[in-house]
Amino acid sequence: MAREREQRHEREDRDNTFVDKLVHINRVAKVVKGGRRFGFAALVVVGDQKGRVGFGHGKAREVPEAIRKATESAKRALIRVPLREGRTLHHDVHGHHGAGKVILRAAPAGTGIIAGGPMRAVFETLGMHDVVAKSFGSSNPYNMVRATFDALKNQDSPRSVAARRGIKVSQLQSRRRVEDAEATD
């Protein structure tokens, strides 16, 4: 049973080439009777640059081991994010975690990734090419990454919106064109 699971994971790894980015590494200390024991905590973001991304946290006595654990954790926590034209968001979204808040805005082609630190790593591994992001409140990398994931999970694709409303995607997009035409007049 365990062997089948390992083989399935190996197949998935061969099919999907993942890009991983180290977001943050932190030295932590455990106080014991004889003094302090130092270790490391790593935050890693992993994605296939085709709309799947995940983040993981790993702790160990050595940095490479902490990074390996974080990468494995991130691969187990992948989410799929719908992208418009494979490059940007479908609509503007907000997300928060703890005291960290983020606003993600869809951007026209050629804009690039305008985002700070931890958010940039998420977008690059996700495969997003055009996005404008702003963070407020906490600048803690863990909170920023979790807030970014919260925002990405809040995004709806036109297909899911149309299904929820009980209409076709073409009807949804034709309404958008009419609204855009009225706004320019």
From Swiss-Prot:
GO molecular function: rRNA binding; structural constituent of ribosome
A Pfam family assignment: Ribosomal_S5_C
PROSITE patterns, A to Z: RIBOSOMAL_S5, S5_DSRBD
One Gene Ontology biological process: translation
Domain of life of the source: Bacteria
NCBIfam families cross-referenced by the UniProt entry: rpsE_bact
Subunit description: Part of the 30S ribosomal subunit. Contacts proteins S4 and S8.
Protein's name according to its UniProt entry: Small ribosomal subunit protein uS5
UniProt organism field: Xanthobacter autotrophicus (strain ATCC BAA-1158 / Py2)
Gene: rpsE
